[in-house]
């Protein structure tokens, strides 16, 4: 009872102090209901009230605005009820606030039951509710108009369930009428960011390139962030953002990809009222007005400002009409059963709906259901060149594009602007000139790709500017973030128009950019440090034939000699028959042997034939001549083959390479090997399903220290410093070029691991794609591409032509090449002298014994038993230096 009395006294005093003599209050109390994520809107609400109260024009300010603010938790129905009742119990005349799908029904029910007007910038409701003034215009008509203008027949519709199903229903009805293919997905309840990514990837597999995103700004930013990460913002994609705050959305990263982005804007930044408000807004104290100074003005904050204008204008109208809006009765009890509505609430609602003012969001009018009407929405378009106003939409004219800036999916004309050509510093493709510091623009560079870009620009008739890629990478997509780096990233994100560089054509790159026909064919190759030239051995003259062949020749020599000896013994035609009628010989001369091919003469004959010198004896029998003939044929083939290989082995210094192929690399552990950290070579091994390459990739990704290098120059330097313990895998063209550069200590080994090509790249859907492709084909047919390669690879080589050693001159033989021959000669001479000495000693001893025996025989003079005479025999068939009984 006491509390009721105190409450009555309070309102009586408030009525006496707050009302003028005409019954209209001097102070209008309004309520404010804000959620946690409406910090800037709260600041805009208080600042708009402050602007009104500080207006010096008393005609415009016949009363003072006062506000009471409550914060509500929309997920808690008790919190929503308590917040509304708190406002109602304070005797507010109208409530400004926000709602979502969970709190909307509660708030609108209270407003309808208690006749309390609720002015909101939240999304428009589908139902026809009373006492709800909707500051935000509906987008349904504008969206349908643009879908028809762009002639979208297949697209994805991502919508937030909190915003209602009116747009979804309208789109589905239009899809049935126009035979559209619409894939609708609700994203309102998604909390996991990865789920957005999965949806986009699924749509991309369906070849979807057009998206209509109907969400609040925060959720749109989240979705677009995933679009950028997945690289789905390149040319060819089109995103329509069903939101009234196009300039509130973070589009910097998206615009660089080249995708076309269309959106709606309710705040006209060229409006003097907007400009004046922003000038004051940015000067506010951040501590008193959070998110005012250092944050851009949201369109919901502009709607909040306009809501205060509407409330103020409505009460001005009521004051002019002398409408009594005083609070009476049980106005402070919102939970009374039955509910007791405020009798003056209908007058206030009617006044609010009758308001027509110009605000920051344009013309503000309402229909009988409190919805915005007769409004204009600007249509914006974002491309690589930036955002621009493409047209406008209203209820009467529908979408009206600006005639001088017709909307198009094509890139802007390249004839009247300078094309940005991204490239990479890589010899011999692009290099700084020695005096580049004194030069400017494209004149600072030289190389194969510099000349190629000049030729292409000449054929396409464009002006261009060479731009070195900032991170020094060719282009790969990060497995985690899905962001492209290098030159591919420059094209994908719209920072360049063409890439003229040693950029390999691959499948993953072709998905996000376009390539011309290859201007150079190549493959992955192995670079190693050139091994030291092997010094020839003393017996290097034996190298033309394997040691197994030499052993076989020795055995063949011995075998032929033995066979010749045996054949000569068995054949009667090799024996000399004795003739007793012949004239008597000189007793002092030895007789001819009956067979010339004893074992030693057979060996001598075979050796003479093998050395192609011959001897003074030859076989007389047919069998012996057959043996000699096949031996001569054998020696002819062997000596000819030996002579043919001898020149190559003695004049060419061989280098023994420890690695000859990728298989050799994979099955050893002493020599490390790696690739460029970001490029097609690394991607080739990562994606390969061949066992050898899978094994190599497994080693490379787990090797410590890392075998991946940031640049090709780093990889080459590592090869040169590793003393043969590191192999670098790179494109064959680069490998061949470096092999021709000083200090000439690297070499390519083995064949190419794959076959691919370099191409000129352009963004997806670029208008330059076809002209550039035709230019490359024309340069190839004219032979200019071959001339450029010869110019930069071989004409400017520093190590001589690759085959110059065999074609231009023959290396002079050194002593080490033929030292073994001299050793054999010296050894043979020494052996001959030693044998001669032995023969001399043996003969001297034999002669001494013979002379002594002869002397003794002469002293005794025994009668000879037979007619015989002793002769020393030197001929084959007798004991050397022995005596034989020869008949006289």
Swiss-Prot record:
Major subcellular location class: membrane
Residues bound to L-glutamate: 502, 504, 509, 680-681, 731
Gene Ontology MF, one: glutamate-gated calcium ion channel activity
Residue positions of covalent lipid attachment, annotated as S-palmitoyl cysteine: 615, 841
Cytoplasmic compartment spans: 568-596, 616-621, 839-888
Catalytically driven reaction(s): Ca(2+)(in) = Ca(2+)(out)
UniProt cross-references to SUPFAM superfamilies, sorted A to Z: Periplasmic binding protein-like I, Periplasmic binding protein-like II, Voltage-gated potassium channels
Chain ranges inside the bilayer that never cross it: 597-612, 613-615
BP GO terms, sorted: long-term synaptic potentiation; protein heterotetramerization; protein homotetramerization
Keyword Cell cycle: no
InterPro entries found in the cross-reference section: ANF_lig-bd_rcpt, Glu/Gly-bd, Iono_Glu_rcpt_met, Ionotropic_Glu_rcpt, Iontro_rcpt_C, Peripla_BP_I
Keyword Cell cycle: no
Record: glycosylation sites: 57, 260, 374, 409, 416
First and last residue of the signal peptide: 1-22
Cellular component terms (Gene Ontology): AMPA glutamate receptor complex; membrane; parallel fiber to Purkinje cell synapse; postsynaptic density membrane; postsynaptic membrane
TM stretches of this protein: 547-567, 622-642, 818-838
Cell compartment(s), UniProt: Cell membrane; Postsynaptic cell membrane; Postsynaptic density membrane
Phosphotyrosine found at: 871, 881
Record's miscellaneous remark: The postsynaptic actions of Glu are mediated by a variety of receptors that are named according to their selective agonists. This receptor binds AMPA (quisqualate) > glutamate > kainate.
Protein name: Glutamate receptor 3
Gene name of the encoded protein: Gria3
């Amino acid at each position: 009872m006491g509390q009721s009395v105190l409450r009555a006294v309070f309102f009586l005093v408030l009525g006496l102090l707050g009302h003028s003599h005409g019954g209209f209050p001097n102070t209008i109390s309004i309520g404010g209901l804000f959620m946690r994520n409406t910090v800037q809107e709260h600041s805009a609400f208080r600042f708009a009230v402050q602007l009104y109260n500080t207006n010096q024009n008393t005609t415009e300010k016949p009363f003072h605005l006062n506000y009471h603010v409550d914060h509500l938790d929309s997920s808690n129905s008790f919190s929503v009820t308590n917040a509304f009742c708190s406002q109602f119990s304070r005797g507010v005349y109208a409530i400004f606030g926000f709602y979502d799908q969970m709190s909307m029904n509660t708030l609108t029910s209270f407003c309808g039951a208690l006749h309390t007007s609720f002015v909101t910038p939240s999304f428009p409701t589908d139902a026809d509710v009373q006492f709800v003034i909707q500051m935000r215009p509906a987008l349904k008509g504008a969206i349908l108009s643009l879908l028809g203008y762009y002639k979208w027949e297949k697209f994805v519709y991502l919508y937030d369930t909190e915003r209602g199903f009116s747009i979804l229903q309208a789109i589905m009805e239009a899809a049935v009428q126009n035979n559209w293919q619409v894939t609708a997905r609700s994203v309102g309840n998604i909390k996991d960011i990865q789920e957005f990514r999965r949806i986009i990837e699924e749509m991309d597999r369906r070849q979807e390139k057009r998206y209509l995103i109907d969400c609040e700004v925060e959720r749109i930013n989240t979705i677009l962030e995933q679009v950028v990460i997945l690289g789905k913002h390149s040319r060819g994609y089109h995103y329509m953002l069903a939101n009234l705050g196009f300039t509130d959305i973070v589009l910097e990263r998206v615009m660089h990809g080249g995708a076309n982005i269309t959106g709606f804007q309710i705040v006209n930044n060229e409006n003097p009222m907007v400009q004046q408000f922003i000038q004051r807004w940015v000067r506010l104290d951040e501590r008193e007005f959070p998110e005012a100074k250092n944050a851009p003005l949201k369109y919901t904050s502009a709607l909040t400002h306009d809501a205060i204008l509407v409330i103020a204008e409505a009460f001005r109208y009521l004051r002019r009409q002398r409408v009594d809006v005083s609070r009476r009765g049980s106005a402070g009890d919102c939970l009374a059963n039955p509910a007791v509505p405020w009798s003056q609430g209908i007058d206030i609602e009617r006044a609010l709906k009758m308001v027509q003012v110009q605000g920051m969001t344009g013309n503000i009018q309402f229909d009988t259901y409190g919805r915005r009407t007769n409004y204009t929405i600007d249509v914006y378009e974002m491309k690589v060149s930036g955002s621009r106003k493409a047209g406008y939409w209203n209820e009467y004219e529908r979408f009206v594009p600006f005639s001088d800036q017709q909307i198009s999916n094509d890139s802007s004309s390249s004839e009247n602007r300078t094309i940005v050509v991204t490239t990479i510093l890589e010899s011999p493709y692009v290099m700084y000139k020695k005096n580049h510091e004194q030069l400017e623009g494209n004149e600072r560079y030289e190389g194969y790709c510099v000349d190629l870009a000049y030729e292409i620009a000449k054929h396409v008739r464009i002006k261009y500017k060479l731009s070195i890629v900032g991170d020094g990478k060719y282009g790969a997509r990060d497995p985690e973030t899905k962001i492209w780096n290098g030159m591919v990233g420059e094209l994908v994100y719209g920072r360049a128009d063409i890439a003229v560089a040693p950029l390999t054509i691959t499948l993953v790159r072709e998905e996000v950019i376009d390539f011309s026909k290859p201007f150079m064919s190549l493959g992955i190759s192995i670079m190693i440090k050139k091994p030291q030239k092997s010094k020839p051995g003393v017996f290097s003259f034996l190298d033309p034939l394997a040691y197994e062949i030499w052993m076989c020749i020795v055995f063949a020599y011995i075998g032929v000699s033995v066979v010749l000896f045996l054949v000569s013994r068995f054949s009667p035609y090799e024996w000399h028959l004795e003739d007793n009628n012949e004239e008597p010989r000189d007793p002092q001369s030895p007789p001819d042997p009956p067979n010339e091919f004893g074992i030693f003469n057979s060996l001598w004959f075979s050796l003479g034939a093998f050395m192609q010198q011959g001897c003074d004896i030859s076989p007389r029998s047919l069998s012996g001549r057959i043996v000699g003939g096949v031996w001569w044929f054998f020696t002819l083939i062997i000596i000819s083959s030996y002579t043919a290989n001898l020149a190559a082995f003695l004049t060419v210094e061989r280098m023994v390479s420890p690695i000859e192929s990728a298989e050799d690399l994979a099955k050893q552990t002493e020599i490390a090997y790696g690739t460029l950290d970001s490029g097609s070579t690394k991607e080739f091994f990562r994606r390969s399903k061949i066992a050898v390459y899978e094994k190599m990739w497994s080693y490379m990704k787990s090797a410590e220290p890392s075998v991946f290098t940031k640049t090709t120059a780093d990889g080459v330097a590592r090869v040169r410093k590793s003393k043969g313990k590191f192999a670098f895998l790179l494109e064959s063209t680069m490998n061949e070029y470096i092999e021709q550069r000083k200090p000439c200590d690297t070499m390519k080994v083995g064949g190419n691991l794959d076959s691919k090509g370099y191409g000129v790249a352009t963004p997806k859907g670029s208008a330059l794609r076809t002209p550039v492709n035709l230019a490359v084909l024309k340069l190839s047919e004219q032979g200019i591409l071959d001339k450029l390669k010869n110019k930069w690879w071989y004409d400017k080589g520093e190590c001589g032509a690759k085959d110059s050693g065999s074609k231009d001159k023959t290396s002079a033989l050194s002593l080490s090449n033929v030292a073994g021959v001299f050793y054999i000669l010296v050894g043979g001479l020494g052996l001959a002298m030693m044998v001669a000495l032995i023969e001399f000693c043996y003969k001297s001893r034999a002669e001494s014994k013979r002379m002594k025996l002869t002397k003794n025989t002469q002293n005794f003079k025994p009668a000879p038993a037979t007619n015989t005479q002793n002769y020393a025999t030197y001929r084959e068939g007798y004991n050397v230096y022995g005596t034989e009984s020869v008949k006289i």
